Amino acid sequence: MAIRTVSSLVRALYQTPKSQSFRIFSTLLHDPPSPDLVNEISRVLSDHRNPKDDLEHTLVAYSPRVSSNLVEQVLKRCKNLGFPAHRFFLWARRIPDFAHSLESYHILVEILGSSKQFALLWDFLIEAREYNYFEISSKVFWIVFRAYSRANLPSEACRAFNRMVEFGIKPCVDDLDQLLHSLCDKKHVNHAQEFFGKAKGFGIVPSAKTYSILVRGWARIRDASGARKVFDEMLERNCVVDLLAYNALLDALCKSGDVDGGYKMFQEMGNLGLKPDAYSFAIFIHAYCDAGDVHSAYKVLDRMKRYDLVPNVYTFNHIIKTLCKNEKVDDAYLLLDEMIQKGANPDTWTYNSIMAYHCDHCEVNRATKLLSRMDRTKCLPDRHTYNMVLKLLIRIGRFDRATEIWEGMSERKFYPTVATYTVMIHGLVRKKGKLEEACRYFEMMIDEGIPPYSTTVEMLRNRLVGWGQMDVVDVLAGKMERSSSCSVQDMAVEMRGKRRRLGRRSENSEDDDDDFELERDTI
């Protein structure tokens, strides 16, 4: 029944006059959208995730202010809201004298792909081809390749390549490279290698770059023999074997544990007149760091200095993370200073590696000082930074400092997600005398229209019932029932002690917080 409802809704939304022609220029492009308006419409989409929700009726009030620029910004903000974002896009297209930008079409393809709405994606592309809404270029298919690869559907990615001709596109070597790169990036290397073998039947001549992509793919899954076979085939076909190809094989050897073989390859590169670059040295640094051998990593770093080569931020981050794992946080700070001197500006991951050490060791003063240092260097904390610091502060009872950091989030352009709210609520619930404050954060989350995890609702309800505060349970449940978010409304029954018939929302249900782990025993 639900499938029929969704299908009929999509068909109704697609009913657009056939006479509408493609216009590549954005409507009202000169009028930048208000950030508040973008936030407001994004909130509406978030609150209307259910296919049965009357999203279009709610959007009517915004019609006079809709521009192609606004649509782009909303779509970028709502990349994790596949179905409502699609409905919003189709609704905007029906506004008189409105035309989407080419960028908006590409963003929507990416949204539908990342949310695994592949049936909708192909319907959208077929309809766009029929009515000539926008030019379906190779770049659109590159987005589709990446989406299928991320969804662990490598065979479908290959089928998408074969369907390019249906849309008037003759695949070329660049398209093949993009497909192979997408597959290898998600470790579907065997599928990539198999499809590569069939590519000759399409009349596509592989380039040196094509071979290098496959070699890097085998390196990614630590298979040096597979990488060597591709490399040897490259030589047999008289391809120009450049530094990129040698680095790829070097990476494969080192990642598979054959660092000695990698060093021999490194020497061979020099004999052939290939001058190693920073990445060539970085391969050894990463290999030594993975083995926990910081001393050898530093020796390679010193050798790079002699050649006036500077590692990139990613390589510095790898060393810093290894130093912290080896309890050498002071050396990590020295390397942090060296990064800045070399012009490799530390990023959030750099600071998070050190922050994780301080939080694991309950070094609250050093953690807060590091947060201040991030402010001075204009490096914005992310959700990992905040979650680590807030967990630490609540764990040791520094509630005043936790509140101060929470209130400063908006100044750092960070807006709490469900994971960050969960850190506060779960932590405070377990602290004596902080149940009321936990309820306050729960109410803030409900007011923001952010659906809580089922475990959060259950924990808070059980604690309130245990303290005989059923009146507070009723207040919270009533607030959830009145929420503008349909998802929050659905969860009100859990606050009232009943189980929903639909699947429960867990900590792993948010793509945005897929690597968030709730510390049940340490808060």
UniProtKB/Swiss-Prot annotation:
GO-annotated cellular components: mitochondrion
Keyword field: Mitochondrion, Repeat, Transit peptide
Compositional bias segments (type: Acidic residues): 509-523
Compartments where located: Mitochondrion
Chain positions of PPR repeats: 101-135, 137-171, 172-206, 207-241, 242-276, 277-311, 312-346, 347-381, 382-416, 417-452
InterPro entries reported for this sequence: Pentatricopeptide_rpt, TPR-like_helical_dom_sf
Residues covered by region (Disordered): 498-523
Family matches, as PROSITE patterns: PPR
Signal peptide (UniProt feature, chain positions): none
Name of a matching Pfam family: PPR
Transit peptide extent on chain: 1-5
Family: Belongs to the PPR family. P subfamily.
Protein name: Pentatricopeptide repeat-containing protein At1g52640, mitochondrial
Natural source organism: Arabidopsis thaliana
